[in-house]
Swiss-Prot record:
It comes from Drosophila melanogaster (Fruit fly). This is Claspin. Residues 1-12, 1067-1076 have a biased composition (Low complexity). GO terms for biological process: mitotic DNA replication checkpoint signaling; mitotic G2 DNA damage checkpoint signaling. Residues 121-133, 205-216, 229-246, 254-263, 273-286, 296-335, 358-373, 400-417, 845-859 have a biased composition (Basic and acidic residues). The modification Phosphoserine is found at residues 45, 49, 52, 64, 75, 109, 114, 350, 354, 381, 404, 406, 432, 434, 444, 456, 458, 468, 963, 990, 1093-1094, 1287.
Amino acid sequence: MSESLAETAAAAENEEQADDSMEKLVFDEEDEQMVSGEDLLGGKSLIMSDDSEAEDGSQEKPLSPKDRRRRMMDSDQEEDAMDQGNGDSIKNSEDVEEEMVSRPKKKVSAIIDSDNDDEQQAEKKTQKEEGKQPVKSKKKRSQVNQEDQEKPVKSNKTKKAVKNKTQANKAEDDQDNPSKEDKPKKVVKNKKQTNKDGKPQTNEEYDHHQQHEKPAKTQKSKKLAKKQKQQEDDKEDNGTEQEKKKPSPKSKAKKSDKSKIDSLMDNEEDAGEDLKMYQEDQEPQKQKTKKSAKKTNKDSKEESGEDQEHQEQKKPLKKIKLDNIDTKEDKEQIVKPKKMAKKNKQKVLSDDESEENQNEKVDQDHDLKKMSSENELEMGSDKEDQEMQEPPKKAKKNKQRMDSESEDEIPKTESEKITSSPKNKLKGLVDSESEPEETAEEVSPVKNKLKGLVDSESEPELDNPEESAGEQEAPMESALSREKPKKAKVVRESAKKALEGMQAIQSEQQRLHREAHINVPYHQPKPRTLKEFLSRRTINAPLATALAGGSPMPSRQPRKSVGLRMTREELEAYAKLMEDRAKEATEFFKSESESDEEDDSENEEPMELKDNPGVMDEMLDNPKTPEQPKNDTEDMTSQAVIEVPVLGEDKTDDTVGDEAMVADSITEEEPIASTSTAAALKLADNFEIQQETNAKSPSKVCLVTEVVELPKLDLSTINITPSSKPATPKISEVIRQLKIEKSLDESPSLKGDPNMVIDLETGDMFAKKPTGVDDLLNRLMKTREAKKHKTTETVNILTTEHGKLEMSKVSIHLHEEEIAKEPKPGAGYMKMQEHLKTLITKKRMEDLRKKQAEEQEKMAEDEEEGMDVDEEYEPEDKPGYAEVTINEDEEIIDKVDSTAEDDGDAEENKNDADEDPEDNPVEDSEDEKNDSESEQECEANPEPETQTRKKNRIIKAFEDDNSDEDDLDLLQTPKPSNVAPITATQLQLSAHKLFDVETRRTASDEENELLDLCSGQFPQTQMLSSDAPSVDTAVISQIPMTQFGGSSQAADELEGLCSGTFATQLPSQAPTQQPEQQEESEVPAAVANRIVSSDEEAQEDALEVDKPRNKKLTKKRPKKKAKLGFSDDEDSDDEVEEFDEESDAEPVEEIPETFVDYDSEENEIVVEMTKKDRKIRAANFVDKEAELSESEWGSADEDEKNMDEYDIELGDEDQFDRDKLRHELGQIHARKMMDQDIREVRKIKELLFEEEEEGANRQRQFRWKNVEAGFSLDDNRTDNGEGNDGSGDEENEHLWRKIRYEREQLLLEKGLKPEVASPLSTSVINTSNNGNSPAIRRLNIISSKKTTVEVKKNSPFLISKTIAGKQQKSAVRGSFLIRDQQTLSKLAGLTKGTSGDVDAAEGTISVKSAKAKNFVFATLTEEEHENRKRKAADILNSSTETGVNFIKKPKLEPRRDKCLIDQLL
């Protein structure tokens, strides 16, 4: 029977496919335009089942136990009706076998009419009315057939659920076919697998698989066929009527429901995303329940149509059935908004008719259920949007559709809410569709949910025709996938061809869908520039925000407290503000794809957005929605407007409405992204509300979620108009608001002078207080102003002395006044110096012109001889001038002695001649004079302190006149005679040069001196030549030229200066050098000394040279000496040359002497050296020593061949890690520092511990390390710890004498002779006497350690017990290291043993002090001495912790006398 049924079903299917192939092609086009909600939701929602059922489902609540019992009773009644219907259908079963084959595939095909002409006529009518009903009917047929196939398995699930009214009927089915329920489960499982694969090949395989399993189902399907035959007969009569009636109520319901859904969507957008995942999990279970309820409701209504009692109920149920069909068609025709409106209208009407037989409590449940279902469906719309971006995944979408249907049809029980395994889902799917007996109460939740799904999908789809075209493809594919598993019984050629054609069409659709451009209605904001963002009204008008109670800086001053106390007026203003802000936000943040959607959505949304909170509250509170659908929507809009003021009356309700509006406006800014979060939160709220009484305001539940969301809102952009009366009675709030208003009246800006300071708290500006840095800078600027040397200023003076007005110009020196105002140290002195310099130079020029006119000839002759040399050094001369700045004071002093100054000038000229051999002698003298004058003028300012310093030196030189004169006589006797030859013309020329040089003079005279010294052009063989650089200073020192009295002296002196002092003239002038160098033979030692300490001795030399010239030259010499300090090397070379010349002059001294010298390998060699050579060696000694000390690095191998070449080594190529090296060096350094710190800490500890001992603050216990082992000092103190306590022996010397006496007495009593210690003591004494022996050196090192470590008090070591007891209080611990050698020698002797052991056998010493603190040596009995003798000897001969042996054996010490190092030193 089952096989025949399968064959007939396949045949019927093939015929249907042949007839409807063109219809399906049309469907495909429509499906391309409409992707179903399931497609996009990922199988979590239904495919577009009936809108009327969704409408009813929206008003239903989860079943309570009472409802379940009631529905079971109803199901029993309906089972009787079904039995009757089955009896009728059995009669017609044979006639309808072909018809039955399609039923497993499409349940509604029987109801609507796939093979019936009447139903086809009805379909045609609905096609004419709705435009695309054939597509829907075919889709519905596939769904119905699937549901019929899945009916047998559904019974198990509904039994567990105890929710369904058809339990009894299923029980019969289970008894008849106990094994048939398991197989359909497998079949459904396979079907789901095929859907997962989403490939037509798998569908064909599944068809073959079903062919084997169909025989088990056919028996069940026969009963169902009979039932459905009856249902068909009944519905054929009423189908056309229903279809005629449908359009108008549908449109009405559509309008009302559309408005409801829009308002709900707007309200639910406010909710957060917290419950989104939870709702997505819950959604399939809800949909299962609703689907099953829907199907059972349909079947029960059809069967009750057979009963005469329920005949009246049959028509509404059939209407609902047809409405479902029509609404399915409308769902795929979402592109047509007008028909959507009709569909919603009919949904509402069908809901009203179906729920006339139900209680008001069920109606309230429906309301809540409806809201939850619509929330889910809104979430579904979001998922649609997400999955629209994945067109290539159509196969998965088909699988998801199947899953969603199966999940929707599984009844929702508390235990099964979480079960989502595919087997259970598919089993529930089969069961839900095998039970047509479920009550109408269960139909309504499904209707509601599906209606919400349709609406939520329709909103984006209405706006996006392309998207809807894409969405239509998915329902078609799902229908095909449903058809294939059912029809694959006996596949004919025509059926196969039709399948292949359908697959080709489907693949083409998928290809087109993949390639199609889909406008995803996600929030894709338009790209905005920063200027556009910043030019928004909410940003540009922060003042209005603050005035209205919002905070421009919400992070600093949140205004929540003000919002809680909003008055009604404020609330209205706030609502208006929020509306404006929402409009602005929606316009600004509108996505690019939204521009087209706006026009359609405006037509379909009859209510304004501001009313959405009211709509939500009304729908939650109003139980009459199913009965008055049309009026409800209108009432909702009206009540929404009224509800805002009502909320405003209550303080807590204020915030509810306020925040609800805030949420609305903000969700409008993000219309799509927020739907899922809003739906999630709404659904959670509805779950809470469902079990609460209606008295509780649902908006308060919203408040919880809204308050959670509020911190995320940008409250700074909310513009709220200021309230007419204070927002809160609290004064602090008013004050704070006033402050904010005041602060916001002005746009923040910084104004004012740069010297002003702005108080950021008050905004006041005040003058900046000058800081210490500013004061310092001001003072510095004043000093800089003072340096503007306004020497003179011309002032016009008008006088009327002689009766007429006369104007006289007077130049006033303002510099003195400035100095008086801002006194600078030495400024007045410097000015006086400058003034005096000018006077002196003028006077000198006059005197020189007079006096030198007579001496001009003689000077010309003398200086012609040195002219060549002068010209050579001319460039060096001028820097020299710049250097010698400071001797003006002396010149002022020297002004008195004109003759002495003449001599000084002459000598200056000589020195200049030495330094500048290329200059004419006349020019040199003039240069000297002019240099002195110019330096007086120019260098007075920069070097006042140096002048004073030089002045002091000059005075000192005057004191030493006698000794200096003697030295100068030796060196420069002819100097005074050189002054005469200088002529006035020469002086004038030098003066001009001086003024030219003046510009080059700076305060950096020392640098110029250094350059002169390093120039290497100064004569280096004589004292004078070494001082020659400073001759410039002498020239500059402005010696009065009137002092050139002795011309003969000047000539001799000039000859002496020029006689070979220059290195360049050594060969030519050697003969003239000879006599002078003989005189200067005594000088070399002094020269060497000068080289060593250039400053001081150079000063003395200068004084010596200056003396014959009278004080003038002495000034110049100090300057010269400063230069000498830089030229040690040159001086040494000069001295060498000097010595050479002296040796030439003194051949008598050249008798060689033999000396022992060392070569580079330190081999001794005998060297013969004359006195001159020794002097040269002595002169060069410093340089050689410097080389040894690596100041001039050299090696012994330098002289060898090729040793200066660089040999490449492998180590040169190594590249070291700098960080690693740095780290290692740091570690080494840290260890060294740590060791040093430890040593220092130990020293400090020792010092502190010693001090604390006396006060008994710290008890220090010095014990013998091992009392039995023998003698070992355990003194923790370091050697340096007691270095400051060296006064102990001196303080307690009388005590030591007493102790020493007692010790000697004790030794005599014991029979120990002090002579025993004599060998050691004598050896120590001998070594101390041998000052050169290395042995002494060692003992000296030891003694130095001992001397550094001293003790405050000397402890009495070797005394009798009685004496030790007496001296315990005064005795202080100590170490042997502290004792002097005499004491140690005695102690060493005492430790050698008793009278029996005089032969230096050593005994041990043990401590027997009363306190461990006391460091006392006690005497031993003879027994103890004998027992410990050997150990003590070992320990005493070993070194202690300090590394010092207390006893040195005498046999080692004689060797120390043989060391040679000490003899050499």
